[in-house]
Swiss-Prot record:
This protein's name: Putative methylesterase 11, chloroplastic
Keywords: Chloroplast, Hydrolase, Plastid, Transit peptide
Xref: SUPFAM superfamilies: alpha/beta-Hydrolases
Record: active site: D213 (acyl-ester intermediate), D339 (charge relay system), H367 (charge relay system)
Length: 390
């Protein structure tokens, strides 16, 4: 919920590519026949290489567009508040856990083009290891404020390609969930689509929860209720709170350091200006700079037509988190180093206040790493999935 930071201040009333041309080689009158043939050969090689590059980029753009279109099609024709993606399990990772008090950190810094390919076949799980031997091969993805299950379309595709089961949830009033956002009065009401799924899990079955942004507070709430059904919890540029703390409390700590957020915030007063706001929206013209400063333009366009308001009441609610329940679930934090919505300093503050088992860092990732760094994020999720039970 990049827009959680919008709560920092008191409420207010209501390229184009240039055509590729061949270099023209000037041949003097004294040039030999072999020199002319060599220049012509080099021009043909350059032209062929340029055509291949163009075809690759065109195919890449078409691949992303088709994936986004598929998500929108499911939104319009599917039912319910979540998008299940099941596949038979056939591989797993090996790994070991680290001690909680050591706060190990890991960085992702591979070289890449400006746009990540959507699918890379079995880059990380092709080691002849069975997914069935993992503690769980089921990821449950929980979006942040204003987002919906649609934002995970790249992550869903990559995880499913590697044989994982994936459930992407629309929280109440988000994505294709039809509840009126202005009528949501509590965190329990907002996260009900998530708690419903966990409640229905068979005895002994566990999942890996991934919460982005305000989704961090949502998975924390679920961890307190269903600790035995959660193998691991991943906080992705997310609100990771302590007992008795609200999301507003945490994000208000850095209230004076985000002018862009203050400019973007729009408070909604369904019950009149004399009452507290019912929801928060964002200025669409500022979305790219605030949330998607490293993301492809196609994904910014998808978000601009898909994002919805976030309910205000859940942001104010203080969490009750116990060591016996919430504290028993293994936690991991993924920092986004180019984040303009939840700056790294605030992410570090949350980490220091409630240290997780391990911290990962996504270089070059904005507040939407599922758009800006999908492959690097995928690699980290697989690494976390392979960590052996404690």
């Amino acid at each position: 919920m990049g827009n959680l930071c919008s709560l920092f201040t008191p409420p207010k009333p209501v390229k184009k590519r240039k055509p590729i041309t061949k270099r023209q080689s000037s041949i003097g009158a004294s040039s030999s026949g072999s020199g002319l043939n060599s220049n012509r050969w080099n021009n043909r090689v350059r032209s062929s290489s340029s055509r291949r590059d163009n075809k690759f980029e065109d195919a890449l753009i078409q691949e992303h567009a088709l994936a986004a279109a598929a998500v929108l099609f499911r939104q319009q024709n599917g039912g319910g508040g979540s998008l299940p993606f099941d596949r038979s399990a056939s591989q797993r990772y090996q790994g070991s856990c680290s001690k909680k008090n050591q706060l190990p950190r890991s960085s992702s810094s591979r070289s890449r083009s400006s746009t990540d390919p959507l699918l890379q076949p079995h880059q990380f799980l092709n080691q002849g290891i069975k997914l069935d031997d993992l503690e769980t091969n089921h990821f449950v993805l929980v979006h942040g404020g204003s987002f919906g299950a649609w934002c995970w379309y790249k992550t869903i595709a990559l995880l499913e390609e590697d044989g994982f089961k994936v459930t992407a949830i629309d929280l109440a009033g988000c994505g294709i969930n039809s509840i009126n956002i202005n009528g949501i009065a509590s965190l329990s009401q907002y996260v009900k689509p998530l708690t419903d799924i966990l409640e229905k899990l068979p005895i002994g079955e566990k999942v890996i929860l991934v919460g982005h942004d305000f989704g961090g507070a949502c998975i924390s709430y679920a961890m307190e209720l269903f600790p035995s059904k959660i193998s691991k919890a991943v906080f992705l540029a997310a609100a990771m709170l302590t007992n008795g703390q609200s999301t507003l409390d945490m994000f208000s700590l850095k209230a004076g350091q985000n002018d862009l957020m203050r400019k973007a915030q729009i408070f909604i007063y369904t019950n009149g200006n004399e009452n507290p706001p019912t929801a928060i929206d964002l200025d669409k013209s500022l979305l790219k700079d605030l949330l998607f400063n490293q993301s492809p333009s196609k994904d910014v366009a998808l978000a601009s037509v898909s994002m919805r308001s976030i309910p205000f009441a859940p942001v104010l609610e203080k969490l009750s988190l116990s060591d016996a329940n919430y504290g028993s679930v293994r936690r991991y934090y993924i920092e986004t180093l180019e984040d303009n919505a939840i700056p790294v300093t605030l992410q570090e503050n949350m980490i220091n206040s409630s240290p997780p088992e391990k911290v990962y860092r996504l270089k070059g990732a904005d507040h939407a790493p599922f758009f800006s760094k999908p492959q690097a994020l995928h690699k980290l999720l697989l690494e976390i999935a392979r960590i052996s039970p404690a």
